[in-house]
Amino acid sequence: VVIVAVLLLTACQLITANDSRGTQKHRALRSDTKLSMSTRCKGKGASCRRTSYDCCTGSCRSGRCG
């Protein structure tokens, strides 16, 4: 019984993996969105330091988030 259950779960995972392939087209955008929602970050134009990585855009130039 355990072997049958393991085989069924494995088959379901393989089918799900094949169905979801290629559905995430904009990975970089999704990562930025996830970062801005999960942490407190500074908006565009806010003061920043290159070493703190606290801009929502991920870019700190000349002391301002870009």
From Swiss-Prot:
Tissues expressed in: Expressed by the venom duct.
UniProt signal peptide: 1-17
Originating species: Conus catus
Keywords: Amidation, Disulfide bond, Knottin, Secreted, Signal
Residue ranges crossing the lipid bilayer per the database entry: none
Prosegment residue ranges: 18-40
Lineage: Eukaryota, Metazoa, Spiralia, Lophotrochozoa, Mollusca
Primary location class: secreted
Name of this protein: Omega conotoxin-CVIE
S-S bonds: C41-C56, C48-C60, C55-C65
Cysteine amide modifications at: C65
Function: Omega-conotoxins act at presynaptic membranes, they bind and block voltage-gated calcium channels. This toxin blocks N-type calcium channels (Cav2.2/CACNA1B). It shows a higher potency when Cav2.2/CACNA1B is only expressed with the ancillary subunit CACNB3 (IC(50)=0.12 nM) than on Cav2.2/CACNA1B expressed with the ancillary subunits CACNA2D1 and CACNB3 (IC(50)=2.6 nM). The Cav2.2/CACNA1B block by this toxin is voltage-independent, whereas the recovery from toxin block is voltage-dependent.
Further comment found in the protein's record: Negative results: does not show effect on Cav1.2/CACNA1C, Cav1.3/CACNA1D, and Cav2.3/CACNA1E and shows a very little inhibition on Cav2.1/CACNA1A.
Subcellular location: Secreted
Gene Ontology cellular component terms for the protein in this record: extracellular region
InterPro entries noted in UniProt: Conotoxin, Conotoxin_omega-typ_CS
GO molecular function: ion channel inhibitor activity
ATP-binding among keywords: no
Family: Belongs to the conotoxin O1 superfamily.
Domain remark from Swiss-Prot or TrEMBL: The presence of a 'disulfide through disulfide knot' structurally defines this protein as a knottin. The cysteine framework is VI/VII (C-C-CC-C-C).
